[in-house]
Amino acid sequence: MNNTHKQLTHSALAIVISAIIISGCAQESKDSAKQNQPESTSKNQPASKIQSASKTDSSAQARPELSEVAGLVMASEPQADLYQGSKELHRSAKVMTSSMAQRIVSSQHASVSDRNFSLAPTINDKFESVVQNGNMVAGETPVSTFSIDVDTGSYSTTRRLINQGQLPTKNTVRVEELVNYFSYDYPLPTNTEQPFSVNTELAPSPYNADTQLLRIGLKGFDVAPDKLGASNLVLLLDVSGSMSSADKLPLLKQAMLMLSQQLSAQDKVSIVVYAGASGVVLDGVAGNDFTAIKTALSQLNAQGGTNGSQGIQLAYQLAQKHFIENGSNRVILATDGDFNLGMTDHQQLVDFVASQSKKGIGLSTLGFGLGSGTASYNDHLLEQLSNKANGQYAFIDTLNEARKVLVDQLSATLLTIAHDVKVQIEFNPAVVSEYRLIGYENRLLNRSDFNNDAVDAGEIGAGHTVTALYEIRYNDSHNRLVDPLRYTATESTQIDDAKVHPHTANEVAYLKLRYKAIGEQDSQLITYPINREQQLTHLHQASDDFRFAAAVAGFGQLLNQNNYVHDTDYAKLITLAESAMGQDRFGYRHEFVQMLKTASVLDKQVLMTEPETRWVSQ
């Protein structure tokens, strides 16, 4: 089989795998819609007009001028509208599979020199380029400081692209968001005074010979959904014209229905929509008023431009209006892209949400769909908004993902248990020669920021796990990247230090964490020494969580074409991940392995084309 046929075979396999995943999620959407349809509602029975619905007790607080608000239509069948969205999701998967398969078949007759073939059109989405962390010399820069990050958007956008037959552009994957997409079986805190546990593990690295991998794991205490306390939620929904495709507004509405089914009478829900203009759809209805919420969502229709900045201001006004003392007050922004009308100064938006977070109102961002044509999905802006507003950024590409974020992990999404969480690790130059932080490139802090409580950092939610990985080289490693300086008395200094501080002579590093308890302005410090006795001899001796996190981080580094990874490939990572599946209660690890295999096929395919066509432009 010549290279062209191999390329086409690999492409076809990638499309088949992607289609199975997409259509499977769409079918679940369809089944979910059927289950949620009330038995008493006839298929031909029209729903009441919104003006009539607003007169009922369940919708008493809906605005009477709803029909004039941008993005609303007078739907006759609210539930049918949601079910139609499920059918459109399924139909879109079929159409995409058929269309892309036809392109592959028709390309089988193309000449070997015809290399303009691509799996999907170039899109205009905005992904910030990541400047990879370098290899640091412990004797020169022994301290590394960063803020934790619980965002997961980079994982699901990567999955979406791969399922469409594309590899992400190099240096656009935030590796920490891939790793933190998964939960790990870290021990829970042993007392209520400390909101999260801290544990470390040290084993050989799979990325390079004669190097080690240090894992730092945090786990927040868990809270049952019925023990969350009251929540004041404002759903800020994008209903602009670009939201009309099945993977955007229809999926968004089903996701919001999932969320609403988890709420109770003590919660407050408001809905603000924005397109060419902004408007209030629901104003502080009870969280268990499912009828009012479902009716309001069913009226939404995609039309007009995107005036997101005005919508955010209106949403925060409602959040302040219904503010719950000692409760969770949060705006949830759901959109497919950039704010392209009205005030569009992104830094001003970031500053605005940061100021609101100091008043106790957080912001979580949910992305839907990917841009095409003149539309653009602004991954970077959504991540920055959530980072500055004590929130989490997730990309919703399937109903399964909506359930994960808004149902399975609702406690972590809504309840923050510690904020401004910072990590600082000091490596011992007497033991460690070099180290490299994997990921967290846009969460790095200055050394002095660690003790400065005025410097903002990330939050951890109830039940959240946070993982960070360092690749390190010991002084006796035969794979050191940096030669020792000729004129520095490093060895004698280390020996003297060991004599003065014999209890630290065998320490690999000293881990420090700072966090602020909820409602507190002063941070608390916790410290942990990491000893070389923790070092495992072989990678297979490490825990499932360690090995799986290493496989996920390795995947992200391969996608970014990381310059510091020399001894791993897709085959090795697939084997490593498959050996570390653990319990995998929700099947997320199995899904990752399938995505890893698809990416491996795509990588082999693009290697057969010119180097400049290897990575899809974003």
Model-derived regions: residue spans:
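Post-signal peptide N-terminal segment of mature Sec-exported envelope proteins
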Residues: 32-83
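C-terminal motif of bacterial Sec signal peptides marking the signal peptidase cleavage site
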Residues: 21-24
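Acidic/polar low-complexity segments with low predicted structural confidence
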Residues: 128-212
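Charged, compositionally biased N-terminal leader segments and the immediate start
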Residues: 30-36, 50, 76-138
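Bacterial N-terminal signal peptides that target proteins for export
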Residues: 2-12
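Exposed acidic/Ser/Thr-rich ligand/metal-binding surfaces
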Residues: 26-36, 62, 196-420, 441, ...
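Long, acidic serine/threonine- and proline-rich intrinsically disordered regions
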Residues: 137-140, 153-159, 415, 432, ...
